[in-house]
Amino acid sequence: MVKHIYSCGRYLLHQATRISRRQMIACLAVAISIFNFQLSTLKAQDTVRKLDEVIIQDVRVSNKTPLTTSTMNREQLDEARTAVSLPFMLETQPSVVASGENGGVGATALRIRGVDGSRINVNINGITLNDPESQEVFWYNIPNLGGMAQSMQIQRGVGASNGGSPAFGAAINMQTLNAQNHPYGEADLGFGSWNTRQYSFSAGTGILKNGLSFDFTYSGLTSDGYIRSWGTDQQSFFGSVSWYGERTLIKLLTIIGSQTTGITWDGAYDYELDADPTYNPSGAYTMDGKTLYYPNETDNYWQRHYQLYVSHLLSDNWSLNAAFDFTHGDGYYEQMKNKKYKAYGLTQYEDGSKHNFVTRKELYNNAYTANLAARYNGENLGLSFGDNFLYYDGEHFGSIIWFRDTAVHLDTPYEWYRNYGDKYDNTTYVKANYDFNDNLNAYADLQLRFINYKVYGYADDLFDMHFTANYLFFNPKLGLNYRISDNQRTYFVAGISNREPRRSDIKDAIGRGDTILPESLLDLELGYQFASARWNFSANLYAMLYRNQMTPNGDVSSSGYALMENVEKSHRIGIELQAGYQPADWFRFDANLTLSHNKSVDFTYTDFADGDTVLQTVTANTDLSLSPSIVGAAIATFIPVKDAKIQLIGKYVGKQYADNTGRECYAIDPYFLLNAKASYTWHLGGTNEIEAQLVVNNVLDHQYRLNAWVGDYFSDDASWYGYYHDRAWLQQPGINFMGRVIYRF
């Protein structure tokens, strides 16, 4: 269980859930000391490369596989690390929309083809990173995740089979840092707007004479944030110990992340933001007729991943891979609430009035993962088969840690709810690539997935949320790839994906007395690619046809997660265009554009004009929520002199809607952002160099707002009697900057 320290009527999460400076210094000392070992030149680099590739071979695909992909190597990831959060590192990739509450330094979100993050499968070396219950990746729980990556591949559509909830629009496959040939080190310091400070320190030994390699990265980020009363303190640690044998690789890896961040998801009304664009209502309460703000309105979380990988080359054709992971997480939201006693089950004290309460909603969970895979690479046939097993257990519980009512005696902390979740998830798959000849090959990927999910206990609003379900899904994918010439190819793939509801979807459905259904997707992709020394072009047509798709209804819970609803029939149909041109060594231009049609079919909802007392039922083909029909990005890169680089980066996101009704009152205006980046590198001899960077975001100082939540409500006030539309916004920052100095050795 989470340990607590009690102080002055409040309690704090045990300080062990932070990465201490002593721990950081110890890691640095170990990293420095291991440089004293002699390096090895005995390991054949081809063997090292093959062993590293075995770890990710079942989640990565080559350009012979008929899937729609974008891959970023280490150099490209370093280039994108001027963005603090991984979603913003990826925002120039096709069909990607990144958003955040504080300019990308706090809570951030990622959507691909309009699909939200809980439907994007994210994995690290083939082990799923998505939380098994929420199916989300909370990026700020592990800051600088991109700095831990050797490469990253985005698979759009249903993607290749892997563990965890399958891709329902995209998958992100991350490969962690590989061992290097020689020792290395890097110190990265940055400072930017809103007193933002970021820092990271990395080092590695290279492969030593005994086959061992040690690598680590420590990162931190603090910021006051753009929005008032926000602030964040984030830390992460990546450590890896690898042993390379003649045909075997054993790797121990740990990733630790912690964060404390102010809550901003409540959003604010137009008139509030017009008066103060940084206004944040979270934590507001009234005392003696004055409005005050609770200073510790925070989201706090600590996450630890411990992983073991064993890869072995049985022969020139056969390889085996085993991976094991243990993940532990614990954390809490602390909030000031103004509610009645009955909201916390304290009906014996109910007096009809609202009172100030400080509450904590806590989470404590563990996940255990085992992946086993075998692969055969023949002259004409590539075959792989494997099994992914995951077990998850978690607890959700909430306590009142302080309240203001001298007439009532209540021992604090007072726990008012607790519930549990257990989930078994097993995936078995077989994949094959067969070459009919030098130009034509076929791809098949068959996945069988079984889930047993049980939730029991009482929810935060006190209803019994007992739920047990078994799901059995068959997810096949079939495709053809045709090589037109040495630099051209075309492909077609059809795939089916099925997935279970999230815990929050189940909880909300139980509370409403509804039935929540699993989702199904039929994905069709037809693509063309051309690449030459100076330019490249690709076009991809896609049709994603859904049954019972879960989409945001525009509202959010008290804990900040999006509330969802089943849409019986819906589709996302579009074309993705991507091109790059380098007419000279000193200039390159890259761009991508997605044009799409994202609709719910025969969607039924109720509508009204503000002040109406009667609702009208409407059935129509409406836009899916948060799914813009136009998304584009462009990068112009200039190299005016050797070791200097200037980039202009543009991002356009078209009009979208906050819910699934397509009503103009809930529309989000389109926006265009222009960022600029300049860098220069000084070479100091050997591998020593210093790079200075300056990034200016939103150069045009465009003022825009993104959605926090929307909802219809009924007012029984005599002067405002009737139905009304309601919405809140998250103001996005104007022009801001980040400067960095990087020393590599």
Tell where the protein language model's regions lie, with residue ranges:
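Conserved C-terminal beta-signal and adjacent last beta-strands/turns
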Residues: 255-257, 433, 492, 588, ...
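N-terminal periplasmic "start-of-domain" segments of outer-membrane beta-barrel proteins
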Residues: 52-83, 109
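Transmembrane beta-barrel wall of Gram-negative outer-membrane proteins
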Residues: 184, 191-222, 227-264, 298-301, ...
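Gram-negative outer-membrane beta-barrel transporters
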Residues: 438, 543-545, 565-660, 742-744
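Extracytoplasmic beta-strand/coil segments of soluble accessory domains associated
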Residues: 87-128, 150
